[in-house]
């Protein structure tokens, strides 16, 4: 849209050197001009491809960010579940310590236990109480971490359903090589790296297209008004008005022949960025393969450790029961009872932490592959 106005006045001599005539002229012009690129030899297409792939890369990274959030929430949930299990185990350990202390006190009263045995039993009970409070503190910290991972204030009163008896994930029926192939195809951040490579390639084409000419279609239409007056009057007419319309259409070609190698340097920079994008993509693929590899074998190790922890818990429970029975008939000493109780407490903690490790490594493996549909 064009809008142009002009007002001018001039002083002109007439009929001698002392006679001055004032000439006033006012003009106004309004119109529309259209410019349409007819040929640009790939400029617009290259720019379209560049921005389209940039948008795709952003969308893929957004999807990966969502997966990161889900992964953090899962990990913190499993940690909270483990902390709750340790609190429950510590409470059982405290109850057992109190039971041992009560039994020792009864035996001390009738002369079947010594004062050192009684003091050791009390010491064991106090240690169990201390460990229970430490477990509760850790539980509060894990709850706070989970709420923060969910985007909530730590003090929000939310009751989480923690099921320590929930079944563990099934064993995988595919190997680590197949999981790596799945990650190469499913991870959004790798798709974003590929989109960035395509974006850099389109940027090279856009830079190369600047070497070519450009042809535009130009069209315009305008309406013009004019008003003038003369003072003093020396010849008629001394004033007047007029208007008319104008239009134009044509082709406009442009071609930069020399720019001090500015365009050439832009092409070199675009090609260098393309090579860098390809290297970043290759590095991302290697890192993804490494993450899947590590997560897979950590998951395998966690499952084996959990199996040993189950056996350890069963053996420690049986050992404590046998030791207590022998202690009641005088075949075991108090230090042996406390050692068996300590071994059971350690076995419970190993069972709880190894179970949480199985869940955590399962979540790590799913996150490393980028596919939430892994079902074995």
Q: What residue ranges belong to the model's regions?
A:
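Small/polar, glycine/serine/threonine/aspartate-rich low-complexity segments that form flexible
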Residues: 1-36, 161-173, 205, 218-255, ...
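A glycine-/polar-enriched beta->alpha junction
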Residues: 1, 32-50, 59-67, 71, ...
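Amphipathic alpha-helical coiled-coil scaffold segments and their short linker/junction regions
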Residues: 113, 117, 152-230, 236-238, ...
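Periplasmic alpha-helical coiled-coil/stalk elements that build and connect Gram-negative outer-membrane
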Residues: 65-182, 295-298, 302, 322-325, ...
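Acidic, low-complexity, intrinsically disordered peripheral segments
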Residues: 9, 154, 350-376
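Short, contiguous acidic/charged loop-to-helix segments that flank catalytic cores in large enzymes
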Residues: 235-244, 257-260, 266-267, 289-292, ...
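A glycine-biased, small/acidic residue-tolerant capping/turn segment at secondary-structure junctions
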Residues: 314-338, 366-376
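Heptad-repeat amphipathic alpha-helical coiled-coil interaction surface used
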Residues: 48-50, 55, 62, 80, ...
């Amino acid at each position: 849209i064009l809008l142009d106005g002009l007002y001018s006045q001039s002083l002109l001599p007439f009929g001698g050197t002392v006679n001055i005539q004032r000439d006033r002229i006012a003009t106004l012009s309004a119109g529309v001009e259209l410019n349409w690129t007819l040929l640009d030899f790939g400029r617009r297409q290259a720019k379209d491809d560049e921005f389209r792939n940039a948008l795709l890369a952003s969308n893929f990274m957004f999807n990966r960010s969502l997966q990161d959030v889900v992964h953090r929430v899962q990990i913190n949930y499993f940690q909270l579940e483990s902390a709750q299990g340790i609190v429950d185990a510590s409470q059982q350990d405290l109850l057992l310590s109190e039971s041992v202390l009560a039994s020792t006190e009864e035996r001390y009263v009738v002369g079947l236990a010594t004062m050192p045995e009684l003091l050791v039993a009390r010491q064991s009970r106090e240690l169990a109480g201390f460990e229970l409070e430490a477990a509760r503190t850790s539980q509060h910290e894990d709850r706070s971490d989970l709420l923060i991972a969910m985007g909530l204030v730590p003090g929000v009163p939310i009751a989480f359903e923690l099921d320590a008896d929930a079944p563990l994930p099934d064993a995988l029926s595919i190997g680590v090589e197949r999981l790596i192939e799945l990650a190469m195809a499913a991870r959004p951040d790798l798709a974003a790296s590929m989109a960035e490579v395509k974006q850099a390639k389109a940027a090279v084409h856009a830079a190369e297209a600047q070497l070519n000419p450009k042809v535009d279609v130009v069209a315009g239409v305008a309406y013009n008004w004019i008003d003038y007056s003369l003072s003093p009057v020396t010849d008629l007419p001394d004033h007047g008005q007029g208007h008319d319309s104008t239009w134009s259409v044509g082709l406009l070609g442009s071609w930069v022949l020399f720019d001090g190698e500015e365009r050439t340097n832009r092409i070199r920079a675009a090609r260098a960025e393309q090579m860098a994008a390809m290297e970043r993509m290759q590095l991302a693929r290697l890192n993804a393969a490494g993450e899947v590899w590590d997560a897979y074998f950590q998951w395998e190790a966690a499952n084996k450790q959990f199996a040993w922890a189950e056996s350890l818990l069963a053996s420690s429970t049986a050992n404590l029961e046998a030791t207590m029975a022998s202690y009641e008939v005088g075949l075991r000493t108090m230090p042996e009872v406390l050692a068996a109780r300590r071994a059971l407490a350690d076995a419970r903690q190993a069972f709880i932490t190894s179970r949480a490790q199985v869940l955590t490594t399962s979540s790590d493996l799913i996150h490393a592959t980028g596919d939430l549909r892994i079902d074995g």
